Amino acid sequence: GDVVLSGQGGAGLAGVYLRTNPLTVSGGNFTVQGASLVGGIATGMPGTAATGGSYGFQVNTAPISVSGEIDIRGQGTSAGYFGIFSDSTITSTAGNISLIGKGDGGVSLTAAVTAGSGALVRNLSIVGTGTAGDGIHASAAAPLVATGGVSLTGYGMTVGFGLNLLGAVSSTVAGDIVLSGRAT
């Protein structure tokens, strides 16, 4: 079935934190609850680190594997903290993936994100807003792959890149790759 996580952290505590153990969802969707968006994430929301230094959604050696849709939204607070921060693979075998993060940095990924498998055409969308850092940062160890389209939208303010992509970005079956980055 479906898995829905909603959390709000305080100083030093992430809104939602997955650690050490894999998260596997068979036959369902995985959602970290979101909120209405105005220019990124406008207000506090489930999955938000409300006060102090913390990530909105943090993954530490806890691979995520889902058969259905993945929808994750996170808002971080304070210097150095991202809306979404993941060092583990995020995979949907038969669904689309949407990641939306806002914080000092928007979305930071150091492991692969993969939407779809085989001939199933599925899409990957990532939107990141960094108030003092990168909108989207993907390391060389973090290829962003979809069988369908890939859309990456990053807004970096002050000292960040809109899109800081060090790894591969690819569509393996049929889809467009759309990159949109802005830095101010």
Label every PLM stretch briefly.
Residues 2-4, 15, 22, 27-29, ...:
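Detector for repetitive beta-architecture
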Residues 10-15, 31-57, 75-81, 124, ...:
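Acidic/polar low-complexity surface segments
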Residues 1-8, 184:
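Short intrinsically disordered, low-complexity coil segments enriched in acidic
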